[in-house]
Design a protein with these regions (language model features):
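Terminal, non-catalytic protein-protein interaction segments that mediate quaternary/complex assembly
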Residues: 4-186
Length: 186
């Protein structure tokens, strides 16, 4: 029964020291309990916490993951420019995956940076936290259902991000519709 399988596979509030610990655990869980969708295996309702998010290096030689590229992609997001040309300027080239996902004008709708900056959401979150560190309303909405036809090839994986200050430390809760553990988890 698929529903029972999904319920059994629910991982909630697991605590990991770093990204590598989380990656290894989730990788094993997907292989063991993942529900198949074509060439994809998935776990549902996965919730976890990483105590040291700065320790984000994942040790998997087969993954061929580039820290240099990840940093360039992050800088592209922060720029707020959704055109793949900007990524090319930062990284030195535009990876093929982004060329395939871009619209005819070179725009990528799943570039989170332009979504964060839409309606000055990121600025608003910063101001909210400065004025009321106890707020639970400091959220950024990324996915907009009204834009579903615009997303075509590049529906954002992240729906929303909530920022809270807990014990004097900034915490971030990310809600996603999907996450590619192999390439997108870092």
């Amino acid at each position: 029964n698929t529903i029972n399988t999904i319920m059994i596979n629910t991982i909630n509030n697991k605590v990991f020291r770093n990204a590598n610990e989380a990656y290894e655990y989730l990788h094993d869980q997907i292989l063991q309990y993942g529900v198949s969708f074509g060439d994809t295996k998935a776990l549902f309702n996965v919730g976890f916490y990483i105590t040291d998010p700065k320790d984000r290096k994942i040790i998997n030689r087969e993954r061929k993951w580039s820290e240099e590229y990840a940093e360039a992609e992050w800088q592209w997001y922060l720029s707020g420019d959704r055109n793949i040309k900007k990524l090319g300027e930062i990284y030195g080239k535009v990876p093929e995956i982004w060329k395939r996902m871009a619209d005819p004008f070179g725009h990528v709708n799943s570039n989170y940076g332009w979504q964060w900056q839409r309606d000055a959401q990121l600025d608003m979150v910063v101001e909210m936290l400065k004025h009321n560190p106890d707020t639970r309303q400091a959220c950024i909405s990324i996915y907009d259902g009204k834009e579903i036809t615009d997303y075509a090839f590049d529906t954002p994986c992240t729906y929303a991000v909530q920022f809270t200050i807990v014990h004097g430390r900034l915490d971030m809760c990310v809600t996603m519709r999907s996450n590619d553990l192999w390439y997108g988890f870092c």
